């Protein structure tokens, strides 16, 4: 039985919430593929390659500690297409609250209609990371706030450098 899981997102930036979901997923599957969505209409704070580099550096040790293989890829089409390309049989989705659940249930239904062979697995966020969103992290960083409680140290350094006043 194939137990490769795909965790798709923008990861702009990588947050402690993302890392929490990745850690949980690595405990469940022997192989996790983190898929960074690239959308031509959006201008991300960090480019896709930089986000991939950050994810590899931050998450490879976590995956290794759990005995899971970790790959990081980019995609610019449907997540179901990315899942098929990497041979995933599971979608991993993190849930912070009921609002996330409502949205994620719709997404799971649509993905299930397009790719019934790929099952969605919801992982509840750990209590300490539930309020974290990448959008809020970007806003705090842009206004000179301290994002260290919300992101890995490497990401905090990159955000500080990105928003440094000349």
From Swiss-Prot:
Per the record, its GO cellular-component terms are:
cytoplasm
Q: Where is this site: Transition state stabilizer?
A: 18
- EC number(s) for this protein? 2.7.7.3
UniProt subcellular location: Cytoplasm
Magnesium recorded as keyword? yes
One of this protein's Pfam families, by short name?
Answer: CTP_transf_like
Involved pathway(s): Cofactor biosynthesis; coenzyme A biosynthesis; CoA from (R)-pantothenate: step 4/5
Q: Cite the binding residues for ATP.
A: 10-11, 18, 94-96, 104, 129-135
Enzyme class label: transferase
Any single biological process term in GO: coenzyme A biosynthetic process
* Functional description taken from the UniProt entry: Reversibly transfers an adenylyl group from ATP to 4'-phosphopantetheine, yielding dephospho-CoA (dPCoA) and pyrophosphate.
Subunit info here reads: Homohexamer.
What name is this protein filed under? Phosphopantetheine adenylyltransferase
Originating species: Methylobacterium sp. (strain 4-46)
Q: Which gene encodes it?
A: coaD
């Amino acid at each position: 039985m194939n137990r490769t899981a795909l965790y798709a997102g923008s990861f702009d930036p990588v947050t402690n919430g993302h890392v929490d979901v990745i850690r949980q997923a690595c405990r469940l599957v022997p192989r996790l593929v983190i898929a960074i969505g690239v959308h031509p209409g959006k201008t991300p704070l960090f480019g896709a390659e930089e986000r991939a580099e950050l994810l590899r550096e931050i998450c490879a040790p976590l995956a290794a500690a759990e005995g899971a293989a970790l790959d990081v890829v980019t995609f610019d089409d449907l997540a179901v297409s990315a899942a098929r390309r990497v041979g995933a049989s599971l979608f991993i989705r993190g849930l912070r609250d009921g609002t996330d659940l409502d949205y994620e249930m719709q997404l799971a239904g649509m993905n299930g209609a397009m790719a019934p062979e790929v099952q969605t697995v919801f992982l509840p966020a750990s209590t300490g990371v539930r309020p974290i969103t990448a959008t809020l992290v970007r806003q705090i960083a842009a206004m000179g706030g301290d994002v260290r409680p919300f992101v890995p140290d490497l990401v905090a350094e990159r955000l500080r450098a990105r928003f440094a006043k000349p």
